[in-house]
């Protein structure tokens, strides 16, 4: 039951943050909604931090990993919305925006994950 609660609570907070980002940012660039992009980049960065952190703290309760990674970051990031937005661009014949959107989401998310891992490693090195 604790496992389900951890995932449920984390996912709820992640989804709320994703909704807020969409509400505040999507209208700024309708072709490539910045709320969706921001949610995926932020999620990528935070999962990099989380993966690095949990790899150095193997004795933490598994519920923490489920709360943060499966729940919160699963609720925050959104492959389905990204897919729907890219298919809309394809249907509208906006091929340049489609290519840019795919590159920004996929490349950016992977880059942000690597940056999160690097950030954690850097903080570990300078902190002790």
From Swiss-Prot:
GO process terms (BP): cellular detoxification of fluoride
Pfam families named in the record: CRCB (PF02537)
Transmembrane segments: 3-23, 34-54, 67-87, 98-118
Regulation: Na(+) is not transported, but it plays an essential structural role and its presence is essential for fluoride channel function.
Chief location of this protein within or outside the cell: membrane
Binding site for Na(+): 74, 77
Catalytic activity: fluoride(in) = fluoride(out)
Single GO MF annotation: metal ion binding
Compartments, as annotated in UniProt: Cell inner membrane
GO CC annotations on file: plasma membrane
Keyword tags: Cell inner membrane, Cell membrane, Ion channel, Ion transport, Membrane, Metal-binding, Sodium, Transmembrane, Transmembrane helix, Transport
Membrane topology, record value: Multi-pass membrane protein
HAMAP family recorded: FluC
Protein family: Belongs to the fluoride channel Fluc/FEX (TC 1.A.43) family.
Function: Fluoride-specific ion channel. Important for reducing fluoride concentration in the cell, thus reducing its toxicity.
This protein's name: Fluoride-specific ion channel FluC
Record organism: Wolinella succinogenes (strain ATCC 29543 / DSM 1740 / CCUG 13145 / JCM 31913 / LMG 7466 / NCTC 11488 / FDC 602W) (Vibrio succinogenes)
Gene designation: fluC
